[in-house]
Amino acid sequence: MARAKRVKRDSVTHIYQTCKQAGTCPPDVVNKVEQTTVADNILKYGSAGVFFGGLGIGSGRGTGGATGYVPLSEGPGIRVGGTPTVVRPSLVPEAIGPVDILPIDTIDPVEPTASSVVPLTESTGPDLLPGEVETIAEIHPVAEGPSVDTPVVTTSTGSSAVLEVAPEPIPPTRVRISRTQYHNPSFQIITESTPAQGESSLADHILVTSGSGGQRIGADITDEIELQELPSRYTFENEEPTPPRRSSTPLQATRAAGRRRGVSLTNRRLVQQVPVENPLFLTQPSRLVRFAFENPAFEEEVTNIFEHDVDAFEEPPDRDFLDVQRLGRPQYSTTPAGYVRVSRLGTRATIRTRSGAQIGSQVHFYRDLSSINTEDPIELQLLGQHSGDASIVQGPVESTFIDVNVSENPLSESVEAFSDDLLLDEAVEDFSGSQLVIGNRRSTTSYTVPRFETTRSGSYYVQDSKGYYVAYPESRNNAEIIYPTPDIPVVVIHTHDNTGDFYLHPSLRWRKRKRKYL
């Protein structure tokens, strides 16, 4: 009997991903993946009660913590007679400070019989300081700013060393200056002064002028750039009028445009030509076909298709757009006269068969736009023009001063003061004896001037060459106004007549015929 071959078990991760959704995972697979085994629980709960932080494990210093390392050769026994030696790894110390060691001589003891007072000018013992100490001062220059030479002075007098070092210069500090400007279009500063050497600022422009020539320093300049003069803010150029252009970029095409497919709009044999004068044709042509509300936010730039009812007859707003079913999008072209033409190709649905087919002609609706003539340029005057020279008027230099003593006036006794009321004109104009003359240059007609009744003799001046003369007659003829009678026939009825007869109005009488009966 052959022994069955043992099949290797799949990985724990793959088994857990497959059987987790179905809930058929073995317990050992779930515990291993979710870390709930016995060993995991011991580490999880044991770490909460035991703390190994003081041993320095994992600190990265390599010193073994506070207790150090214990050699592996020694057992766990206890040493007798002394403190256990702590073994630490050897660390290379870094040398700090000067390496040279200065020798110091020993001091001889002072005898008991010697005086306790030590004079300052005498030296009883050896000198504690060395003879000469070599001192080197290094000063690193600052990278920013100009370099400053700092002298180092070393003075040696006797056995004392005195070092005089100049104070270190203060390094330059960076200063950041910010500028905030708010533009006000209604306010503009205009400041002009006499041009001189220097720099001046005008609003946001900086103008640097120099009265004398410049001097070139260094090697010769090989490349010279031609500079153009910038016009001043008060200089305007007069442009000559140019003929109107047909397009914004009047460039000739490199190759001739191919022949377009379809029917030409200007073919009078196949397309009906209809000029349109209504301005709605440019913005909303659909309002010319049928009545609709105006929508100013909608611009018709596409093809419009209109559906008409067969049984109903609709009169369009414009008679030229009768039975229009389809109105194409706008097309722009140029006429031989140079005008811009806006065209739309429309189709009429004049006849409709029983099958539903519509038959109609094609119509070319167009409108020529008026040309914009180029007017002559208007010469503008400069506002606030300055010559650039400042005029200084000094009053004390150009004026003459006269010292007059007002307190003492020798003529004050002989001068009489009059009131200002004497200057008023109290005469009353009544226009008595005035004359009215109305002149005219065209006519020299003479008029008879009657004599007016007056108590005083009046004088009249008659112009021989020109003028009108107005005369007022003494009597007037008032015409009597006669009001006409009404045109309505009046029927007169006599109430006192008891005969029963009446007066017949002439308009009610029987008219005789022109010819009598035969």
Swiss-Prot record:
Keyword Phosphoprotein carried by entry: yes
Gene Ontology molecular function: DNA binding; structural molecule activity
Cystine bridges: C19-C25
BP-aspect Gene Ontology terms: microtubule-dependent intracellular transport of viral material towards nucleus; symbiont entry into host cell; viral penetration into host nucleus
Sequence motif: Nuclear localization signal, positions: 1-10, 510-517
Compartment(s) of residence: Virion; Host nucleus; Host early endosome; Host Golgi apparatus
Any one annotated GO CC term: host cell Golgi apparatus
PTM summary: Highly phosphorylated.
UniProt cross-references to InterPro entries, sorted A to Z: Late_L2 (IPR000784)
Annotated region (Disordered), positions in chain: 235-261
The keyword Disulfide bond is assigned to this record: yes
Alphabetical UniProt keywords: Capsid protein, Cytoplasmic inwards viral transport, Disulfide bond, DNA-binding, Host endosome, Host Golgi apparatus, Host nucleus, Host-virus interaction, Late protein, Microtubular inwards viral transport, Phosphoprotein, Viral penetration into host nucleus, Virion, Virus entry into host cell
Protein family membership: Belongs to the papillomaviridae L2 protein family.
Job of this protein: Minor protein of the capsid that localizes along the inner surface of the virion, within the central cavities beneath the L1 pentamers. Plays a role in capsid stabilization through interaction with the major capsid protein L1. Once the virion enters the host cell, L2 escorts the genomic DNA into the nucleus by promoting escape from the endosomal compartments and traffic through the host Golgi network.
The protein's assembly and partners: Interacts with major capsid protein L1. Interacts with E2; this interaction inhibits E2 transcriptional activity but not the DNA replication function E2. Interacts with host GADD45GIP1. Interacts with host HSPA8; this interaction is required for L2 nuclear translocation. Interacts with host importins KPNB2 and KPNB3. Forms a complex with importin alpha2-beta1 heterodimers via interaction with the importin alpha2 adapter. Interacts with host DYNLT1; this interaction is essential for virus intracellular transport during entry.
Protein name: Minor capsid protein L2
Species this protein is from: Human papillomavirus 36
Record gene name: L2
